[in-house]
Amino acid sequence: MDCKEIDIQNYKEEIQLCGLKLAKEKANSFIEQHRKLIFEKMNFNKVVNLGAIDGEDLRLIFLKQDLQEQDFPEKWPKDLVDDIYKNNLSVITQKCYLTLDNYSSIELLSKLIPCGIPIPTGYEIVGHIAHFNLTHQQLPYKKIIGETILHKNKCIKTVVNKLEKLHNVYRTPELEVIAGENNLETIHKEGKFVFHLNFEKVYWCSRLQVERDRILSYLKPNQTALDLFCGIGPFSIRAAKMGCNVICNDLNPHAYDYLLINRNKNKVEDKLLCFNNDARKVVDIILNPISVKKYPKNFQHFDHVYMNLPVNNIEFCDVFLGLLKKSDPEIWKTDNLPIIHATGFVKQSSYEDCISEIEIRIKKTLPNFVKESILQFQVIKNVNPHLQMFCMSFPLSIEDALSDPSKAYQYIKPEREEESLPLIK
């Protein structure tokens, strides 16, 4: 049968195993002495209780699959053969069956997918959803991959494959359900935090948790962070629980809706000021001496800027050029400029080449930036052998803060403009 059409739930494999009959009281010591020769398989009973036969309580111990009766004794290990003769043990062959329960996901897929096709070993778990990025070679086997993951992981109810790269402005994926329920509404847990989301309508990456941990380590209680592409709030909400105030924004109206839900579910309502707007416009609102007065004092200044989207958000740094010229001098001074944490992608391999390329790119938005000011450069992941995702932390320089503000950028109009600004009680 074509493996692409196998009913994985009823998978059954017949094998022939050699077993040895011996008394119950000798079974444990025999297994201990010949442990490397015993058949071991997940959820497989390697010792069978045969009960009383001719007045003796017997056990059947299964041996490794490569020990076959027709090869006994010539091709069997000498110490095992000696033990069999010494104890007058019976060698028998028995038909056994292996099912879904006896294999890990990787083992099962290795048996079902043809040799030469890479086995998908990594996938993201988001709530009850398993998320794959299958290659062109793996796509013909997507159903068997999905069904295997579904049945081997009881917490997984839906398996999806991403169809294309993230091209739209919201960075939301186009997904295909390849197994399980067609339900992309889920609740994801990250430590003690819960996040409600629709995986198809918002950007989410569970694998960025370690990176969020790293950036959060920069923050101190009572500081204010500006999370410009906050999504459904994984960074903002965790920062708020640390005692920080967070100005958070996302242009995606669906992400904004879930942000408000998650803010309430995690009980940080008073710590977040939530926008559904263009990132640059939010910065200009907070910097503007008049508009900033609408908001509580603890949201009128920010110590850190976190930008984890879009693909290359260094270009958004132009909004910080001239910060001191377009802000309230009572709020902003040369000694309280923010630290910027920006992510992006770079095609260079060595550290020096990466830094040099990034310096060239960032100077287009912050002309006085110098690579020596970088506090930390972190490779988040290797997307492929020629492309790295990075996060770079650096302080906004006094020279750039005192420069004339940029006039090169324009705002993106939010879908729900009437709801794009926070409601202030």
Regions found by a protein language model. Name each.
Residues M1-K425:
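SAM-dependent transferase fold signal centered on methyltransferase-like domains
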